[in-house]
A protein has these predicted regions:
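CBM-like, beta-strand-rich accessory domains located in the C-terminal region of large
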Residues: 38-186
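Carbohydrate-active enzyme catalytic cores, enriched for enzymes
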Residues: 1-34, 88-89
Length: 186
């Protein structure tokens, strides 16, 4: 599942989240990469966290959200998808998309993501065009049912009946995060 759609309906952005170019992934019916869900609709830290870009499987620049979230149900400047393309071949599928949510930052950075799927691997490539050297952080939220083994550059995701190698050109770190699989439960 890949989110390359508008933030929300233009007339009702209240339920929009900072999830442009985010993805979810299941293996053999088991959720691996998840959307962490929503805890509450009332104003507060968990509402803000649920909507934030850092709580989704995408990239933050200098820890900014892709869109400007105000209070519990308002949105200011919004990230918009500015292109989305896909290529289907016999044994692979590739989707590429970009958004303009960070153009309010210095030198108008554009985040692009390319996800390529093959029979034996998935490759995710993020790039930042323009910009002013902002610190880019890609986050991936794992299901609580997934175990992790890791070293500096690689990690293994362990589920029921599978073990997946994750490789990166950058350092991988593991941090705990909030997950709201059911509304109102943490």
């Amino acid at each position: 599942l890949f989110d390359a759609a508008e933030l929300a309906a233009k007339y009702l952005p209240a339920h929009g989240h900072g999830d442009a170019l985010s993805f979810e992934w299941s293996v053999f019916g088991q959720r691996v990469v998840i959307n962490p869900g929503v805890f509450e609709y009332d104003a507060g830290k968990f509402r803000d966290l649920s909507r934030s870009t850092k709580s989704h499987n995408t990239v933050t620049l200098d820890n900014y959200d892709q869109s400007e979230f105000w209070k519990s149900f308002r949105v200011g400047k919004r990230a918009n998808i500015i292109n989305c393309n896909n290529i289907i071949k016999n044994d692979s599928f590739t989707v590429t998309a970009s958004h303009n949510g960070y153009t309010r930052l210095s030198k108008n950075p554009i985040h692009s993501r390319k996800i390529s799927m093959y029979p034996d691997k998935i490759k995710i490539e993020d790039s930042i065009e323009k910009g002013n050297g902002q610190n880019a952080v890609a986050r991936i939220m794992l299901s609580p049912d997934i175990s992790v083994e890791m070293n500096d550059r690689n990690c293994f995701l362990l589920g029921k009946g599978f073990k997946i190698l994750v490789e990166s050109d950058n350092k991988i770190s593991l941090k705990e995060a909030w997950c709201f699989l059911d509304f109102g439960h943490r």
